[in-house]
Amino acid sequence: EGILYTHVQLEDCDEIIEQTILKGEVVERLLYELDGVRYPKHSDIPFYHRQHRIVLENCGTTDAEDIDEYLAKDGYAAFEKALFEMTGEAICKEIMDSGLRGRGGGGFPAGWKWDSVRKQPKGKKYVVCNGDEGDPGAFMDRSIMEGNPHSIIEGMLIAAIAAGSDEGYIYVRAEYPLAVNRLKTAIAKAEEMNLLGDRILGTEFSFRLHVNRGAGAFVCGEGSALTASIEGNRGMPRVKPPRTVEHGLWAQPTVLNNVETFSAVPLIIRKGAPWFKSIGTEKSPGTKAFALTGNVVNTGLIEVPMGATLREIIFDIGGGIKDGKKFKAVQIGGPSGGCLTEEHLDMPLDFDSLKKLGAMIGSGGLVVMDEDTCMVEVARFFMNFTQNESCGKCVPCREGTRRMLEILTRIVNNEGSLEDLDLLEELSATISETALCGLGQSACKPVQSTLKYFRDEYLAHVVDKHCPHCNGRKKVLQIDPVLCKGCGKCMKQCPMEAITGQIRMPHVIDTEKCIKCGACWGCCPFGAIREE
């Protein structure tokens, strides 16, 4: 029936069996309730009702370790169609016709990548899945790897047929142990059913798939750094061209896409390019998964059609700003993205629209901020993250981000000057134009966007020497170890993963990571969070 019960206790089980399973009646008191309304089904809840889940559809509804459940939902049907009914050229054309663009960053056309590798001279070729999700507070790829690993494998199999590859790698950060185990289990089950390995399903096609664990460096999300890491080298980007499609893993042509991109492929092959094109916008078809966090009522993973507006996401799905406060900004795209304002709430959310504003979808992080947030502090936080994650290979990123962080810290502490603002703009332009890889080239977007849309807050720090939103941030948020019961609620709400601690033990806030958004303050039931 699809009925959803919440906060079920052991003593509720007898009533559920008697009323729902035997009599078909709903136990009203166990239903999810919002604003006085009870919702019988998961799909009826406003947070889910307004979404369009295709990639995340099976996450949480099927057993990720049971291949039979995946097969029961048309799993590997697209692979069989590609294997027995389509050529590599036809597969590439179908993906290009669908308009599928990479979901891991800049939105590069996936079909073009595949076709470029297909056209390379015959020889060893690789298919690589980028599961190195490094943005703070982003868990889209992790959710798919843990909840629907076979969709990734099927997508990679189809890519292998298209490109003419017989070997692939899934690169996952070691901080995702469950994802690693689920992927390895899924690969083993697929091998048992001859869906992976040699002479698959009695054909001449063979494909071996490996899981490679990364150390968690943010820069390894960049293609050439990722392939270097798989090879056993230090994860550092290289100069391009040549591109990965020509000179990738072990200097061979390589198809490299992220988890969400590969997961969409089986749906496109099975349902057709026109179906996928019917969702989203003309130039950005399909859906996109986002991690909605920050000062918003409903947080979590969402999936919406491309072209959905920020207003729909934040206010319809997210339920609006916490405690009735005013919306101020949303940071989109993680450390490589920009901050947008209230005037952008009705703008279609797609690759091209965001690029015009100096922002990017990136992996899909969405951090919502209310009227009490200091945007200079936000810019400083993301610059601190980027500077720490810089591989150090190129001078613009290594030294430029360090100097920018010093300037931002000076400004936040009310010790900056007007000349510092000019220097920030000059450094931002130089780094964006001269850095070696995408990490460095986009590292300044949070600073550039906040300078553009929230310049008055910079002026408050450097001219007035007083910020109405943070008072210079001399004070920091701390957790009282006596009052803290270790319930973990603040850890779940923190968009920056700045809170650590064991259950039933006092938690601790990392002041370097904390952006003082107040999410933990508002959710603590014990009043243990204070400002010092």
Predicted feature locations:
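Short amphipathic, charge-patterned alpha-helical segments
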Residues: 155-157, 306-322
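Ferredoxin-type iron-sulfur electron-transfer modules in oxidoreductases and energy-metabolism complexes
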Residues: 1-29, 78-95, 123-127, 131, ...
